[in-house]
Swiss-Prot record:
GO terms for biological process: defense response to bacterium; defense response to fungus; killing of cells of another organism. This is Maximins 3/H2. GO terms for molecular function: toxin activity. InterPro entries: Bombinin. It comes from Bombina maxima.
Length: 144
């Protein structure tokens, strides 16, 4: 009889333990679901804030670009514009990362690069050639 009593009590303890483990698993899974839902909400709010910031930055960059667009720029302002254009490209690449590399490679047109170099050469060579021309003119006057 003692043996039957011990087996019955052991069985009751084992079933109670199994139920508590099952309840713990259910509460953990419910907690996980609630936690995951709250994380989704937080990500959604963060995404909305990030998209708002990106929109504000894009708007500010476009406003600055339009301000500098219609007047003669200094070299410093030109560098600021280049940085703004880079920021705009970076912000666009956040929205569409797979298209960013295509846009960057399309942006480097060989004709545009050649035109940039010729503009730089003209800007550098113009004053140098005028100085050489005036020096040669002065030498010819002294000789002649």
């Amino acid at each position: 009889m003692n043996f039957k009593y011990i087996v019955a009590v052991s069985f009751l303890i084992a079933s109670a333990y199994a139920r508590s483990v099952q309840n713990d698993e259910q509460s953990l899974s419910q907690r996980d679901v609630l936690e995951e839902e709250s994380l989704r909400e937080i990500r959604g709010i963060g995404g909305k804030i990030l998209s708002g910031l990106k929109t504000a930055l894009k708007g500010a960059a476009k406003e600055l670009a339009s301000t500098y667009l219609h007047r003669r720029r200094t070299a410093e302002e030109h560098e600021v514009m280049k940085r703004l254009e880079a920021v705009m490209r970076d912000l666009d690449s956040l929205d569409y990362p797979e298209e960013a590399s295509e846009r960057e490679t399309r942006g480097f047109n060989q004709d545009e690069i050649a035109n940039l170099f010729t503009k730089k050469e003209k800007r550098i060579l113009g004053p140098v050639l005028s100085m050489v021309g005036s020096a040669l003119g002065g030498l010819i006057k002294k000789i002649g």
